[in-house]
């Protein structure tokens, strides 16, 4: 919420949740919660796009112009306003329909191993085994921090091209457990003390 507000990109910062307590906390930090999310969209199996599309459908009539939507995950504590600004500018300059926050894999995925039932390792892609890691193509992953969407993604585009905004690795943490949260706190402190940005 803080990064979104500080970015000055958004007319409104809206939180989609099915939980009254979360709604209350979101409001206390300056977000709006004009509706509670339908329970059918609040399980562990519903994809992000369905949730964002639902929010877009509910909000589009209350805006004079709702051209771009940004979904920011609640589990992105190291996200800064400048990342949102840079990603939005990238989207505008590239005339893209969508921007995904990405980060480079820390190791070449072409040299990944798989284990069989006995624990024996084999290369997932053996043809890359003899190659130097610096000669392999860089690969990126969706780092699950934020997504920008043009409104056409919700209204009529079934297939749209996305471009990636590469986040610094020290700003990317996937928070699923209390240990992940502790790691995020330690990383935030390190980023601040070492002035990594």
Can you say where each PLM-predicted feature lies in the sequence?
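N-terminal glycine-rich phosphate-binding loop and ensuing alpha1 helix
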Residues: 1-16
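Short, structured coil segments at secondary-structure junctions
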Residues: 9, 29-31, 117
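Short, high-confidence coil segments that cap the C-terminus of an alpha-helix
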Residues: 10, 64-66, 93-96, 191
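Short phosphate-binding loop-to-helix
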Residues: 14, 20-70, 78-82, 86
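Short beta-strand scaffold positions
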Residues: 16-17, 148, 175
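Short beta-strand/turn micro-motifs composed of small residues
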Residues: 17-18, 73, 102
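Conserved core of the sugar-phosphate nucleotidyltransferase
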Residues: 47-50, 68, 77-169
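Hydrophobic helical membrane-anchoring modules
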Residues: 166, 170-197
């Amino acid at each position: 919420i803080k990064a979104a507000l500080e970015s000055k990109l958004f007319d409104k910062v809206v939180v989609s949740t099915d939980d009254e307590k979360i709604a209350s906390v979101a409001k206390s930090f300056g977000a709006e919660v004009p509706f509670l999310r339908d329970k059918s969209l609040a399980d562990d199996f519903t994809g992000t796009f369905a949730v964002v599309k639902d929010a877009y459908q509910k909000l589009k009539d209350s805006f004079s112009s709702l051209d771009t939507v940004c979904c920011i995950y609640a589990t992105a504590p190291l996200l800064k306003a400048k990342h949102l600004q840079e990603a939005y500018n990238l989207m505008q300059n590239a005339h893209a329909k969508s921007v995904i926050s990405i980060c480079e894999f820390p190791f070449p995925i072409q040299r990944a191993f798989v284990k069989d039932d006995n624990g024996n390792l084999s290369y997932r892609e053996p043809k890359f085994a003899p190659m130097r890691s610096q000669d392999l193509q860089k690969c990126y992953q969706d780092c699950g921090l934020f997504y920008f969407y043009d409104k056409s993604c919700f209204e009529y585009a079934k297939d749209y091209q996305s471009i990636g905004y590469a986040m610094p690795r020290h700003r990317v943490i996937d928070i699923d457990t209390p240990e992940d949260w502790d790691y995020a706190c330690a990383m935030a402190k390190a980023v601040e003390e070492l002035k990594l940005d």
